[in-house]
Amino acid sequence: MGFHTFDADDADRLERASVRYRRVSAEEVVGPLAGDGAGVLADLGSGTGFYTDDVAEYADTVYGVDVQPEMHEYYREKGVPENVELVASDVSDLPFADGELDGAFSTMTYHEFASPGAVAEVARVVRTGGRFVVFDWTADGDGDHGPPVDERFTADDAVATLEAAGFEVDSASTRTETFGVVARAP
């Protein structure tokens, strides 16, 4: 399961607000992160910066982390907010110090990096008590949209992986095609 990467040639599809916000609203991502004063955050799998832009309004700094340089190129052409810094990196080897981030989020990209090692890396870089917000396609969905079902995870899978890395899960929910998990770093 997992490790499906979105085709950068189709990056325009990631900017369709009417479609994306039906799956995950900006408020669902921003709310858990802005509640404690957002500070320094990382968008893991930032792509074109669609959700990065929403969160940037409430944060001092947001690192847009993506493994595909083409996604950063698209984002630069679109326009990157002043408080967003683009970082080319795999989630399993993040270039941040221990506890450097006040929080992190991943919208529809968890399946691209969801290994115990990558989640442990997120736990390393997010300060104790900082939130990690995950929304992704669920393996319980029909697969009409998003990655193939056999490359997805369930909310229970994500909770188990996060808890194994020391995260304390605040909430987990499943919808028709997506799941959401909000957790706090150890």
Where are these regions (language model features)?
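Conserved class I S-adenosyl-L-methionine
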Residues: M1-D36, F50
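C-terminal alpha-helical "lid/dimerization" subdomain adjacent to the S-adenosyl-L-methionine
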Residues: R13-R20, R131-V182
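A generic alpha-to-beta junction signature in SAM-dependent methyltransferases
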Residues: A34-G35, A56, F113, V126
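Conserved acidic residues
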Residues: G39, D60, D102
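Class I SAM-dependent methyltransferase SAM/SAH-binding core
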Residues: A42, G47-D93
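A short acidic, Gly/Pro-enriched loop at the edge of an enzyme's catalytic core
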Residues: S92-G103
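A short SAM/SAH-binding and catalytic strip from SAM-dependent methyltransferases
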Residues: D102-P116
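A short glycine-rich, Lys/Arg-flanked "PGG" loop and its adjoining helix->strand segment in the class I
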Residues: G117-R131
